Structures are given as C-alpha cells and as structure tokens.
Amino acid sequence: MMLSHNPIVEPFALAHATIVTGDKAGTILRNMTIVVGADGRIEQVAPSIETSIPAEYHYLDGTGKIVMPGLINAHTHLFSQGKPLNPKLATPKGQRMVATFAHSPLGKPYMAATVRHNATTLLESGVTTIRTLGDVGYEVVTLRDQIDAGQILGPRILASGPLMAIPEGHGAPLIALTSGTPEEARTAVAQNLKAGVNAIKIAATGGVTDAQEIGEAGSPQMSVEQMRAICDEAHQYGVIVGAHAQSPEGVRRSLLAGVDTIEHGSVLDDELIGMFRHNPNALRGYSALVPT
C-alpha cells in the first residue's frame, strides 16, 4: 500500500490482534501488537506482552480482530466492475459503441474515475498489489503514478495499458492495440513502453467475453512470430509479458514465443508443464501460470 509522503497525523499501535502470516505452514500468531510509525511503515510486530507502546502513539484495541498480509491480484481490469456483461454490449456492434465512448473526450474522464474507484475498492478489500492486463488507454498508468507520488491512496500497480491483439481479435477495439505483422507488433509494444507501462499483455487466443460462436474462446489468434516480436521488444526493457491463452495449443504457442505468464490457462500435459519450467525465451528462463 502506498501512502502520502506527508506524515500521518498519528502513529499507532494495534494491540492484542491475531495475525495470519500467510506462510506455507499456515502459522497463526495470537495476542500480537503491530506498531506503525508516522511514515506509515510497520516498525514492530511482537507479542503484546513484550511490546512497549510509545505514549505518543494512538492505541487501537485489536482484540478479536484478524490481521493478514496484503493480497495480490495478478490479473485485473480496472475499467470493469466485474458484473455480468449486458448481452447487447457483447455483440460486435455493442463492443464498437462501448469502445467509441470509452476513447472519446467524454469517455476518458469517465474511465479515469472508474479505474480510481475500482482501485480504491480493491484496496479497501485488502488487496495491496495489482497487475492490470488490458486497459482502455493509459488511465491506469496515470493512476499508478499518482499513487506512487503520494497524491492519492491506492494499491501498488503494475499497469499494462492496452493489450496486444490481432485486428478484430480478443479485446479489440476497446482495450487493444492491433497489429498484423511482427513489425507492427513491435511498434505497438514500443508505444506502450513509451507511455510508461510496466506490464505487457497479449491476446494469444480468443476469449469468452467477446466470443461470437462456440469454439472461438481458446482458438489461437496470434502467430508465434508476432508474439515472439512482442516478447523480444518488452524483454529488452525488463518488462514481463502475459498472454491470454485458453487452450493447450494457445498455451504452447505462447510459451514458444517466450511469454512469461500464461493467463487463465487450460489443461496442461507433461510437455507443457516442462515448457513452463524451462523456457529459454522467457525473461527469467521460466514461465508461470496465473489461473483465473
């Protein structure tokens, strides 16, 4: 969680709380005190009986309360409320109408307010780090910078900007930059990087939200060569690449291209699992699955 650079009015101590550590063993620590300084940083975590709370610190009784580490949401879309889509807006015509509004002078301030509201909701739900993977424009990059500068309160954000898709592919036209060749794909990645993104997203296959017929979701869309160009361009700047892939073939192609994270995923056989574990084209030599 990022806090304003201005000091908090009062440092505080939360006493007699139960802490869920989140470690592999499932450790639970009871009757603990957490001391937080004026800069918003945790200064001490110790048994309450052993903790001396400075007189100037505000005392909060945590009896019966649970404290846990901040949650991480590694796959978010802040432009969306997470509610079921209106079927009329899921049609090609409906998608074009939504995209036209979202990218208009009237729609851009609306999207900026929406992503800020949704980021606040996540923070208040205990999520302190998020990665967006498909934004309307660069409104989340702006929000991230405002949070990092201490101008507003919010979670840590890794922002992708628009995702990479083929023409009329998954996510287009609302949240995608489209390209038909490896060269065009590199240009799209460069545009996102120049805007300050710290994540890149590829629509490697079709998706459920905008599929128009059975079998479209999971059907491979982007070529290995085009995805490889995207990965190479992003990896030059140390930026990891995630790929929307909802079929075994979509996962395989993405891993061959050097994608760092597979989003959503599919049934995995031993060969695919081996490709995750040893992926020489990925930034760190391996890839990870982010199931949703």
What would you call each of these model-derived segments?
Residues P167, G206-T292:
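Active-site core of metal-dependent hydrolases
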Residues V127-T129, Q151-R156, V197-N198, Y237-V239, ...:
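Short, well-ordered coil/turn segments that N-cap beta-strands
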Residues M111-A119, T178-N192, Q246-G250:
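Short, acidic/polar
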Residues G70-T76, I130-R131, I157-G161, I200-I202, ...:
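Hydrophobic faces of well-ordered beta-strands that scaffold small-molecule active sites
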Residues S80-M111, L153, G161, A165-P173, ...:
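Active-site gating loops and adjacent loop-to-helix segments of metal-dependent hydrolytic enzymes
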Residues I66-Q146, A257:
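Metal-associated gating/positioning segment near the N- to mid-region
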Residues E168-R228:
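Active-site gating/metal-coordination segments in enzymes
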Residues L3-E10, I19, D23-M68:
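Histidine-rich, glycine-flanked metal-binding segment
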